[in-house]
A protein has these predicted regions:
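A substrate-engagement module of RecA-like helicase motors
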Residues: 24-47, 55, 99-236, 240-241, ...
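N-terminal pre-P-loop "Q-motif" helix
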Residues: 52-68
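Pre-Walker A (Motif I) flank of P-loop NTPase domains
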Residues: 69-74, 105, 234, 433
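A contiguous, basic/glycine-rich beta-loop/short-helix subdomain that forms a polymer-engagement track
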Residues: 206-234, 247-255, 359-468
């Protein structure tokens, strides 16, 4: 597969048996025809190109087609090696063909693992694309794109600045200079092995891009966005966190991260609640405060940095005793989590933090960057939430066993919403778009009830189930 800013699928033909009554770029197809084409693909055409006929795979595809055509959610418990990826790819593509070409929208495939994303883009989609072209189902390759956070891509302007800095440091930095030259050829930072975290942080696309940027027209990242949101994209692939972030943007009326889509596939669906909890958790950490202090110090706001560091140490001093008490008699390792309790000392430390952050905002507003102002405001909001927690969240203290800085224990105050399944329903299922959820662990003993509850599907969402 050709690597580019958008993952286009190169087409190469497998051995072509007698085409017989094969189609020439089929037009819109209906429900019955879609099921008939699924049978033909899995029993004749795909086996002719090297795949094995699997009855479970065919059953899955029919269940998925039913859900897509009836605007339902399909819950599919299917083990490893059954071929569920081809099942949902075929179902989605046949379902897309029900509409005239100008009215087709992409589908989104969300997974939990990078390995599955890579396999989908580099193996499954190219193979299926050439088979469908060979037998006249489509006349152009399936175009799929990997969508992920902007911090994983290079900013051309920041890259130029960083390369200039490294070039001035001589031969000792030759290896880093070579890596930065490679970034000039590869937009995706995840594909540049050996790149340090420090360099990544200094060359990635910033949180807020300046619309007046001199490089905007030639910017590779902007080109990637234009191509990703173009009309020729059939499939968008992302991870669960990116899917949920897009849903959150839509819920809040912000600019969506994904192009509007007509159906959703969630592979490794048992990992979706975990991703939702990770994103919904309100977290105030000593590590975050230490990083804030470093940013302030970088702007030569030494006094402000010292104030934030003092607040972080005070917070660690209040909650570190819980670590020691809970661990008494159980060795040197701290527990991962302990319940959060409201104490007088804790309330005072959180109040002092809120006051300090507010003073920094007011005193240095002109010198602070917009992202830093947002960060200060967000930390104030979190500190206030822990100073007066309510019944809508479950609060705890989390320890990592490492240090955030000299004499500073790394701990986080965490708050998880109690109504997480309801939030998932509001984010993903309330819109009543058809969806396919698949995993090898959705049905415990054939019972989907626990998974439905965790996934937020108990709000009246119509669904159909399949165990293969």
């Amino acid at each position: 597969m050709r690597r580019s800013t958008v993952n286009g699928c190169a087409v190469s033909f497998c051995h072509q048996p007698n085409r017989g009554d094969c189609l020439n770029e089929i037009g819109p197809i209906g429900y019955e025809a879609a099921h008939a084409h699924a049978e033909r693909l899995f029993r004749q055409l795909l086996p002719a190109c090297g795949l094995t006929v699997r009855e479970g795979q065919i059953k899955l595809c029919h269940t998925m087609l039913d859900a897509l055509y009836n605007k339902e959610v399909a819950l599919c418990d299917a083990g490893v090696g059954l071929g569920k990826t081809y099942a949902y790819l075929v179902a989605c593509i046949l379902w897309q063909l029900q509409r005239p070409r100008p009215l087709r929208s992409p589908v989104v495939i969300s997974t939990a693992s990078v390995a599955l994303q890579d396999a989908t883009l580099q193996e499954y989609i190219p193979f299926l694309s050439r088979v469908l072209i060979q037998y006249g189902y489509i006349d152009t390759p399936i175009r799929a794109v990997l969508r992920k956070g902007k911090e994983r891509f290079a900013c051309d302007l920041r890259l130029q600045e960083r390369r200039l800095q490294i070039a001035q440091r001589g031969e000792r930095f030759a290896h880093r200079a070579a890596l930065l030259r490679e970034v000039g050829r590869c937009l995706d930072l995840d594909h540049v092995a050996g790149l340090s975290r420090y360099d990544r942080r200094h060359i990635c696309v910033p949180t807020h891009c300046d619309r007046r940027c001199a490089e905007r027209e030639s910017c590779r990242y902007q080109q990637y966005l234009r191509e990703s949101n173009g009309p020729t994209i059939t499939i968008q692939v992302c991870n669960h966190n990116y899917l949920l972030a897009d849903a959150l943007h839509r819920q809040n009326g912000w600019k969506p991260l994904l192009r509007d889509y007509q159906a959703l596939v969630v592979d490794e669906a048992h990992r979706l609640p975990e991703a939702a909890q990770q994103m919904a958790t309100c977290r105030l950490s000593t590590q975050g405060l230490a990083q804030l202090a470093q940013q302030l110090s970088g702007l030569h706001l030494t006094r402000a940095a010292q104030q934030v560091t003092a607040c972080a140490r005070a917070l660690a001093g209040v909650y570190a005793p819980q670590q020691n008490e809970a661990n008494a008699g159980h060795g040197d390792l701290p527990p991962v989590q302990v319940p959060f309790t409201v104490t007088k000392d804790g309330t005072l430390a959180l109040a002092a933090l809120q006051k300090t952050l507010a003073e920094i905002q007011d005193t240095y507003r002109v010198r602070l960057t917009l992202p830093l102002l947002h960060q200060l405001k967000e930390m104030r909001t979190r500190a206030a939430a822990f100073a007066q927690p309510d019944d809508t969240t479950v609060c705890y203290v989390e320890y990592s066993g490492i240090k955030s800085g000299p004499g500073l224990s790394h701990l986080s105050l965490c708050a998880v919403p109690r109504d997480l399944p309801r939030q998932l329903y509001d984010l993903l299922w309330r819109q009543e778009k058809p969806a396919v959820l698949t995993s090898g662990t959705l049905a415990a003993g054939g019972d989907f009830a626990p998974a439905r509850r965790q996934l937020g599907l108990e709000g009246g969402t119509p669904d159909r189930k399949s165990v293969v």
